[in-house]
């Protein structure tokens, strides 16, 4: 869970076995193959939100309020479903499993069981690695 880390301090998040998420570049990239997927701003914010909550379930209403409305996007179930699908396709296009994002029926979504490593950029000079299991 990364909720205590300011988003503007996150350089990269390594999800699972080498999927690199760079929020400021709106990209997902596989470390081994170099396969890259570009995300739109709402998808980037959605993935950040899910990462912030880790394995805790994020309800649809929470996501619609904190991601979609907060970013001026249409806050509808259909739009949320489209963005979850878009994220899963982006993840699989880099060779990683779509199950990195888990649907909890009638409840919401959460991150899967993958390890999450966060690389922080402090003052543009030094990098820190924090590992969450």
Predicted feature locations:
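A short linear beta-strand->loop->alpha-helix hinge motif most characteristic
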Residues: 4-12, 97-125
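Short amphipathic alpha-helical recognition elements used for nucleic-acid or partner binding
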Residues: 36-67, 87
